[in-house]
Amino acid sequence: MTDRNAKLLDTLKKDYPDAKCELNFDTPFQLLVAVVLSAQCTDKRVNIVTDELFKVAKTPSDFRKMPLETLEKLIYSTGFYHNKAVAIKSLSDDIVERFGGKMPENFDDLKSLRGVGNKTASVVTCVALGGNALPVDTHVFRLAHRLGLSDGKTPDAVMNDLKAEFPENCWYDLHHTLIFHGRYTCKSQRPSCDKCNLQEFCNYYNENVRNNK
């Protein structure tokens, strides 16, 4: 890792010492469901929904038995409720039929589930299973470009660039601190550049703010 990247990550960790996944869950399977629901939805809204959802369904078997229409109603407010309900039902079927009802414990098995892509499998691996993964959501994707860490056109390309720039033991902290920075400071439309401690690293600041002062 370069001195520049080490300083960048150290600054992020100092600014967000409590950065972590903000989705509420008790088991890795519940996190898997929550991550599916989080697509195009805020963590706050997902937590409101899962607070009620997990009272009536906690396991793959529970979701497998639940009628699709019932699940759709319970998750309606997260948006794209039909697609999300189908995904949750499908992955629950796979876990019961292929894994005996036990939650897969590695990235490859998670990714093999219907309705589970790279990002979802990476989040569960990183957050709940203690594995080395580096999920790239919209915040990580945006900041990787603004901070000059990647010019990748896809989340997978950005993920590969970040993995090349930072050692595995930094991936967890990098993922969560970038999300917090993107969520609370470096927002998509109106970033709070005046409050940011990463100005020296930031292409966006240098091109759009400093040169206009």
Label every PLM stretch briefly:
Residues 2-212:
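Catalytic cores of DNA base-excision repair glycosylases
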